[in-house]
Amino acid sequence: MKTTTLRRALIAAVAAISVATLTPIAKAADPYSAPAAPTNVVAYPSTYGVTVRWTASPSVKPAIEGYIVSGGVGSCPVFVPATKHTVALLPVVKGQTTVAPTVQAVNSYGFSAAAKADKTYAVSTLTKTTIRDKYVSLQFLQLSDLHGALEASSTSIGVASLAGAWAADRKANPNTLSLSSGDNIGAAPQISSAFEEIPTIESLNLMKLDASTFGNHEHDRTIDHVQKVIGASDFQWIVSNYSSLTDLKSGSKAAKSYKIFTLGGVKVGVVGANTETTKEQVFPGNLKGASGEIAISPTADGVNAAIVAAKKEGAQVIVALVHQGWTENIDGAVQGRLFDWVDQIKGANIIYGGHSHQTYNSYNPGVKPGTDVIIAETRNAGVEYTRTTTCFNTETKKVVSSATEYIGKSAVASVTPDAATAALVKKYKDQLAPKLDVTIGKVSGVFPRGGTPAVERSGETPLGNFTADAVRAKYKTDFVLVNGGGIRDSFPAKTYVPLNTALVRPATGVTTGTFDVTFGDALTIFPFGNSVATTTITGATLWKALENGVGGAYPADGRFPQISGFKFSFDSTKPIGSRVVSVTKLDGTAIAADSTKYTIATLDYIVYGGDGYVGVFSPKESAIRDLYVDVFIDAVKAATAGGKVLAVPAADGRTKKVA
């Protein structure tokens, strides 16, 4: 499904329920905008459904392509081209209990907010309206990048409430499939990572997840661990762009390139894809199994082959789970690998993204009936999930249309958490608390992490400065270079919830104050178990390392360098490999790209080529030292000894982005 430049533009999260929309990154002079919501939406019953009328949204650039009209859960959404009248007939389908009409305008920049109709109808009261048996309403519940966020927090829903919400959604529409776009595990809080991520898999089982693709973080550990995860999963692992699935099995359970599910008599084929950058994002060797190393294709050839195979087996609806994401908007155009895949994938009705931890929703009207495509991505850590309603015509054997809602924490506040899932979380939490709720010091505020773009992946950040300085102080090296992607939470950690309620923690939205920090915070921030490595490099090697750090998919990659002992500047508008402008010592003396030797501390992960640092450092000439997280903990303890409070360090200009 090839998209035009304008079609590859977007707005984040429209059709959202109780979730703030993501403001597109755009220049002040950007002439593009998403449509405003339509107005004057009225609804009234008719013989063959509920008629919905509205006043068109004001004209915008790009032009409005049409309107998505939905009746809510269990309904049959329809797409009305903007060239047609501003009226639609919503069929009432078997099993539907209410008709709650909403209308959204869509252009190639994205969706408007959903405008509600003046009336909502209980189907039981529509005695003169024909129930349209030829339509089947399907429901898809989807999340991505859960990263073991099992506990509820100020932002995360928590798996017990997710399980309760999904159970309620299934009750409202039994024709439901629950899916994940990957990164369920890895870079996770201790409640998951300390137990080899099995608590997350057990939670997903209780949530009745049906299928998941792999994300890069599913490979944070060895293939042996992946096999253990597969063995513990009651759901199907699906990936279509791996060179081999031979080693991805445990007993009778095995990963597949596709699987067909039957919902309300309709066969739904699910395919999946992981990001091809996984190899450089995980520890070298993690993709090697007994039969060899898995290669991950950067193209959709395998996915398209799986779609063809699924359709030959009878699949009537295709859902693609793609662990690729949206990154930003530039001059109205969407950026991110997800959209390269959208261009390549042929025959999918729904494409769910992931990986970049963003909220995104778009709609591609097809040229032929039944070829429209919903594209959606959801935020990480269980902050929200998507609920897509898809209408299938059993006579034409085509999808009529789809509509997606974003369900956030406030929207599920009234849902009863699932007791079994809550008990599971408590069981693991109780085992951790005595070790992890131990205070290591106090801080004067929150050391930030994340954002758009993520601070630790785009520039100098307090947590990066403090940690890099701590490493240099301990090992007395000239320089330190560590990857920003290794920082997985703020400090105190947002996703670590102490059992000890006496600890002083930041309230929602509060970033200043004196807060307790614990072992649990440290292990949540640095969950990978990396060790510090010391070695000797030349000035030329340092420049090479920095070019890699500001290359790749900057500012989305985890390779961005957090440094100590020197300064550097870069220009992100220059070609990859030529972005570093200057490198100097702290006193301003230039560091040339020559053979002058320096000592440096980094991580074993980087020494062995992780995050694109292939061939930069020599493993043979490197000494593996202490655990990275232990160095951090010791530094916090030292800085807070005698009751002192560790202040959030101000930026000192060690890293400068000139453009």
Name each model feature, range by range.
Residues M1-A28:
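Secretory targeting and sorting signals
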Residues L126-V412, S458, L463-A470, G552-A553, ...:
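Acidic, metal/ion-coordinating pockets
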Residues D133-Q139, G148-E151, A163, A168-K171, ...:
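Catalytic centers of hydrolytic enzymes
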